[in-house]
Amino acid sequence: MSFNLKSKGKFAALLAALIISVSVTGCANTDEKTSSTNSSTVTKDSVSSASIASDESLDSDMFTDRDKEVGYDESSAVMVAFSSSGATASSDSVSVSGSKVTIKSEGTYIVTGTTSDGQIIVDADNKTKVQIVLKNASVTCKSSAALYVKQADKVFVTTAKDTENTLASTGDYVQTDDNNVDAAVFAKDDITFNGEGKLTVTSEKGHGIVSKDDLKLTSGEYNITAASHALSGKNSIRIASGTYTLTSGKDGLHAENTDDTSKGFVYIADGKFTVNCKGDGIDAGTTAQIENGTFNITSNRDSSSSSSTDSASVKGIKAGGDITISGGTFNLTCEDDGLHSNSNVTVSGGTFTISTGDDGIHADSKTSISGGTINITESYEGIEGTEVEISGGTINLKSSDDGINAAGGKDESGFGGGFDRDNFGSSDASITISGGKITIDADGDGVDSNGSLTVTGGETYVFGPTSGDNGAVDYDGEATITGGIFIATGSSQMAQNFGENSTQGSMLVNTNSSGEITVKNSDGDVLVSFTPTKTYACVVISCPGITTGQTYTVTTGDSTTEVEMTSIIYGSGGMGGPGSMSGRNMGNGDMNGNEMGGPGGDMRGGPQMR
């Protein structure tokens, strides 16, 4: 049994972004010339339009109609064309210097053509809105960002329908001002990506797309490869929809504001995501909220630099504040935790398949699950929090240590970087199960609370340890059951039953015969039947119909015993709370069993069936 919760971060509100106005630079070095036609302003779409509908109340707060608008008026737009000989523009609102173009005024700009060393710069008034339409454009810059938003109120980058576009940076970034440009797309202000085409972003030495304000993506298809983070937003990353293939040397999505810790959130309404990263799949400095989408995330350290001292964080979805998930499909293969919050994790829907080297789901404070389907196929500990509350959903988990673990404290390695096995304890910890169907296969404790354990409903099935000093049920405070089905099998050395304050009967029975477990009442009616997948020496059984004053027939494998419930609790186990037992062994064993009780427990531990 081990614990170690990670340092609690501040719970953040979703706030609007600051606008920062600073001057910056470019890539090419030829003499500037200015083109000669009239500039254009953004007008209502006359080509096509598309918007992303959402039933979520947050959607209108996260995105404007303009964020989702992919249409543009080509007849009034400024044309910018790249070629091997340089660039041209159809308006004096664009200055051209070789293969570097600088947009200076509000309007719509359609970019076409290819350059192997060019740049698009937006350097306009800080109240200006600019739409850049990429129409089979390919822009590579050898020493800076291919698209550099130096100043504007907001820039919209739209991929034209059925087009393929590229923005890339190669080589080391050469700084010519104090803005520290370090991405293939670098924006000092708000930037939104949308469209009905494809965009490939490549950064050999830095990030893929960076916004020092809000980064929004509402539609389109994106393939981003970066040495560092693929998507990075200082104040927020907000995604309405779209398809994303992200390959990164650090995080897939990274939102962080070290100047204002109330900012740096991630909000995803929908989308399809394939993330292969050497950092975290999704990393939010404050909150992470996901409404829907498909997420295939693989996060593993760089094998060439992996060591016991490597501080890289390699979690699936991580947040300094709350993680809230209400839907979606998640396939998470992570070297560290699958879901990790320094505050609370709340799951109300979605389908999860998680394979991890540490915790499947971890919260420093509370983990709440009220719906969804969660399959944790591999983990050190399955579900963890100071408080764990399960009221619905279907959960199947496999753990090499504890299945469900409630404890308190902080795991110093949890958010800042690498991971260690959790190792903490707290009497304030609690596990509450009121609904859902839970199946646990644990090599350590099946259900382990350093405080209380309360079961009021649901179905819980535990395949606990087959030997050693762990048990299928382990608690330090009080354990009560008032409803639901709870069956836990495991070794008998540290077996515990529920306590006498329970209102639903619970029995603990020792046995030397593993196999199907059946409980029948005195009329021969089957109250519960269950077949564990592992051998066991002890079983805890509680279900509706088990009451004081009745006699039950319990069969485990080929052994049978008759249990008379003279108390609400039959057999207290090695370290359980007070309880009494009585029964007639119908096999060849003795009445008293062979287990030694711990503090507060019964010395007999329940009858042993042979």
What are these regions (language model features)?
Residues 19-26:
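C-terminal motif of bacterial Sec signal peptides marking the signal peptidase cleavage site
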Residues 108-171, 473-475, 479:
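Extracellular beta-helix/beta-solenoid repeat scaffolds
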Residues 47-128, 159:
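N-terminal domain-start segments of secreted/luminal proteins
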Residues 2-13:
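Bacterial N-terminal signal peptides that target proteins for export
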